[in-house]
């Protein structure tokens, strides 16, 4: 089975499958362009209820996490003040250790909140990767088309 390099690297089937998937995607996602659903709020009530339930669940999980972080931070700050007092050569400073610890604490607490409503399961990861590969092969196809046009 001696295959030439051209046969080995032939991705025409993959490109055809991608073009078919792209055509199908455009067909189903062009409903708004054809004037089908113009108001995004006119979706089914069931979808609204499900998304609201997921949002409430996410909010409650975030609040629980924030409470745990606050409790851990309080115990950490208490320990930090004792460490800072003994770490200083003099043992005392002009500034209170609680003030320094609070300033340090504020620097670390300015992390942006996570995006609500997302769950990172295997299906979601596969969806993200499929969009990545779709974009990659779209760019590849466009690049090849442009290079073929330049040759002509």
UniProtKB/Swiss-Prot annotation:
This protein's record includes keyword Ligase: no
Disruption phenotype: Degron-mediated knockdown leads to decreased cellular levels of Sm-class snRNPs, abnormal splicing of a subset of introns, and cell population growth defects.
InterPro entries hit by this protein: Smn1 (IPR040424), SMN_C (IPR047313)
Any one GO biological process: spliceosomal snRNP assembly
GO cellular component: nucleus; SMN complex
Subcellular location: Nucleus
Residues spanning the membrane: none
Record has Ribosomal protein as a keyword: no
Documented effect of changing residue 143 to V: Localizes in the cytoplasm
Region described as Disordered: 88-110
Biased composition (Basic and acidic residues): 91-108
Region described as May interact with gem8: spans on this chain: 130-152
Subunit structure: Homooligomer; may form homodimers and homotetramers. Part of the core SMN complex at least composed of smn1, yip11/gem2, gem6, gem7 and gem8. Part of the SMN-Sm complex. Interacts with yip11/gem2; the interaction is direct. Interacts with gem8; the interaction is direct. Interacts with proteins of the Sm complex, including smn1, smb1, smd1, smd2 and smd3.
Family label: Belongs to the SMN family.
Function of the protein: The SMN complex catalyzes the assembly of small nuclear ribonucleoproteins (snRNPs), the building blocks of the spliceosome, and thereby plays an important role in the splicing of cellular pre-mRNAs. Most spliceosomal snRNPs contain a common set of Sm proteins smb1, smd1, smd2, smd3, sme1, smf1 and smg1 that assemble in a heptameric protein ring on the Sm site of the small nuclear RNA to form the core snRNP (Sm core).
UniProt-recorded name of the protein: SMN complex subunit smn1
Provenance organism: Schizosaccharomyces pombe (strain 972 / ATCC 24843) (Fission yeast)
